[in-house]
From Swiss-Prot:
Its EC number is 3.1.1.-. The gene is PLP1. The keyword Hydrolase applies. The active site is at S82, D229. Possesses non-specific lipolytic acyl hydrolase (LAH) activity. Hydrolyzes phospholipids as well as galactolipids. May play a role in disease resistance. GO terms for molecular function: monoacylglycerol lipase activity; phospholipase activity. The nitrogen atoms of the two glycine residues in the GGXR motif define the oxyanion hole, and stabilize the oxyanion that forms during the nucleophilic attack by the catalytic serine during substrate cleavage. A motif (DGA/G) lies at residues 229-231. Residues 38-242 form the PNPLA domain. It comes from the Eukaryota. This is Patatin-like protein 1. GO terms for biological process: defense response; lipid catabolic process.
Length: 432
């Protein structure tokens, strides 16, 4: 570290969870000096796919650092959209004794137990078809009640690590991004985590939009939010999260951040987990779509083509953008995207919460672990295998080692500065 940054300055920066590792002048590969980010796509019941992958990663971390290791202990920021936002809350919201509400291994049980009640499988018929034209397919009451019971009065600034959750405001016609970063300095953005999760899950035609208000107790100001699923703008939240982090770097909040340069994005270590898509299978043809009117664009064979297209386009464009950025920085190995573009049938839907399909989705997650590491070809948009990179499971083992080294380096730096850590949750000791 440059001599001008004393141990006192290091200790000040160690006191925050946000970007605990960014230091100018240190090599990007230096343990303890990187920004770690986990991003989780939206996809409804397909949240079982990232649930399976994240359980594998957390198990590898537990092998390295003990059974109490949780993902929130290792990531400076967890970002999620729609079902990914719900997973983000599970991983980052405080539960008993200041530890995360859910272990990653508990995520799939949540979907298996609650999926059929969130998305009850109704019989098809003329009445159901007509109803789908005039209101959302599901009333959302069970999901809303479950989220409120699970998260209680937890607000976004209370999370154990920084979170970023995109939504879309239908009144303002613009994305609204909720983050721990903003909530700490903007009281009107410090919403209940339950309201944020309900909002980011409100996929048009599937679940109702959500309205709520926040109040600034100091000024009495009130803000109203009229929100739907953030997936219409950022179904893959990777770049949104990186933008939030970079924004914090640029404002140079010296109470929270090391003095870093906005160009130091080579210090990111990013894991982006998808929920699968159908892009390699060929979903529709121009000949088919040319004959569609409003009804077919909104509902076709149990799916909502216009919504599916928006969300798939959002995810793929973000992946291409992120891949190009990391390649331009010669940091390809710092960005791992795990995605499967071969889904079909019920597995490709967001609401087929049957027992058979949910088991199949878990199997798809396991299959993705065994697949070779792939990277998007920026010319074709297709995923191609990375020669010599091994399987996604191999890559996650390596990722776990990097995360563990990062955490250990931060703990060592904190102890060297005279900090404590004994008796504290490991996530607190890591981030401080």
């Amino acid at each position: 570290m440059a001599a001008s940054y004393s141990c006192r300055r290091t200790c000040e920066a160690c006191s925050t969870r946000a970007m605990a590792g960014c230091v100018v002048g240190e090599p990007a590969s230096a343990p303890g000096q990187r920004v770690t980010l986990l991003a989780i796509d939206g996809g409804g019941i397909r949240g079982l796919i990232p649930g399976t992958i994240l359980a594998f990663l957390e198990a590898r971390l537990q092998e390295l650092d003990g059974p109490d290791a949780r993902l929130a202990d290792y990531f400076d920021c967890i970002a999620g959209t729609s079902t990914g936002g719900l997973i983000t809350a599970m991983l980052a919201a405080p539960g008993d004794h200041g530890r995360p509400l859910f272990a990653a291994s508990d995520i799939n049980r949540f979907y298996l137990d609650n999926g059929p009640l969130i998305f009850p499988q109704k019989r098809c018929g003329m009445a159901a078809a007509m109803a789908a034209l005039t209101r959302p397919r599901y009333n959302g009451k069970y999901l809303q009640g479950k989220i409120r019971k699970m998260l209680g009065e937890t607000r976004v600034r209370d999370t154990l690590t920084n979170v970023v959750i995109p939504t879309f405001d239908v009144r303002l016609l613009q994305p609204t991004i909720f983050s721990t970063y903003d909530a700490k300095s903007m009281p009107l953005k410090n919403a209940l985590l339950s309201d944020i999760c309900i909002s980011t899950s409100a996929a048009p035609t599937y679940l109702p939009a959500h309205c709520f208000q926040t109040t600034d107790d100091a000024t009495g100001k009130v803000r109203e939010f009229d929100l739907i699923d953030g997936g219409v703008a950022a179904n893959n939240p990777t770049m949104v999260a990186m933008t939030q982090i970079t924004k914090k770097i640029m404002v140079k909040d010296k109470e929270e951040l090391y003095p870093v340069k906005p160009s130091d994005c080579g210090k990111f270590l990013v894991l982006s987990v998808g929920t699968g898509s159908t892009s390699d299978q060929g979903m529709y043809t121009a000949r088919q779509c040319s004959r569609w009117g409003i009804v077919r664009w909104l509902r076709n064979k149990g799916m909502a083509p216009i919504i599916d297209i928006f969300m798939a386009a959002s995810s793929d464009l973000v992946d291409i953008h992120a891949a190009v950025m990391f390649q331009s920085l010669h940091s390809d190995g710092d960005y791992l995207r795990i995605q499967d573009n071969t889904l079909h049938g019920d597995a490709a839907t967001v609401d087929a919460a049957t027992r058979d399909n949910m088991r199949a989705l878990v199997g798809i997650g396991e299959r993705m672990l065994a697949q070779r590491v792939s990277r998007v070809n920026v010319e074709t948009g297709r995923y191609v295998e990375v020669p010599g990179a091994g399987s996604n499971a191999d890559a996650l083992r390596g990722f776990a080692r990097q995360l563990s080294e990062e955490r250990r380096a931060r703990l060592g730096r904190r102890n060297a500065c005279g900090g404590g850590g004994e008796g504290e949750p490991s996530g607190v000791a890591c981030k401080r």
